[in-house]
């Protein structure tokens, strides 16, 4: 029995090595090469289909042959940290990011590919996120209460203009200014992308960083960061922005603490 188990394990190991790297390993001894090839094509095509739907721009940028080579390399070299089929795309983003220092020559490479992969993955991640929108709050309390960022709203910053990349736009140098985006899931379930100003992006980031700070303190701290010479005017303009974000349900007011009387 022990010999059988050991033999089975050896066969399984040989098969998985072949499926990961058919150029480096042969099918298990005694296995029909034609059948082994069927398994190889099945695994690779399933992975191509799974990832291709999440990264359509990446596929278009690399072309069919380049995309196939990248996915084959992912299968060969990367060791996923989760067995969950639905999280393979997140693992693929990490894999592409890991190639920055050693892109290799098996497929085309552009320095923006890691950010493009992340940008495309974000849409799926936010669609699948198990989170509820903020509870409606009173705009009159925006200055006096701590603020909250909706879990369905993600402020993101990219070195590259990821929303403009495609087969017809393959820059070799990043723009001077970062691309600041607001990714949000609306009630219909659709994920929307919008470009935001540095002021709006930093305000949203601060709300995440300093959840105990009330709105007034947030705006004054923002004015100090910006080096505003006219603080009152800056805060007034920022308050208009804060109200807009509140109307969009991107930002809300923290619930007031509940105090219970001791009996």
Task: Identify the role of each PLM range.
Residues 206-211:
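Short helix-to-turn junction characteristic of helix-turn-helix DNA-binding domains
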Residues 76-201:
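Hydrophobic packing positions characteristic
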Residues 1-129:
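N-terminal, charged low-complexity regulatory/assembly segments
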Residues 246-259:
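A short, conserved structural fragment
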Residues 237-249:
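Basic amphipathic alpha-helical segments that dock to polyanions
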Residues 212-224:
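Short acidic, hydrophobic short linear motifs in intrinsically disordered regions
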Residues 224-238:
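Short, positively charged loop/turn segments that connect secondary-structure elements
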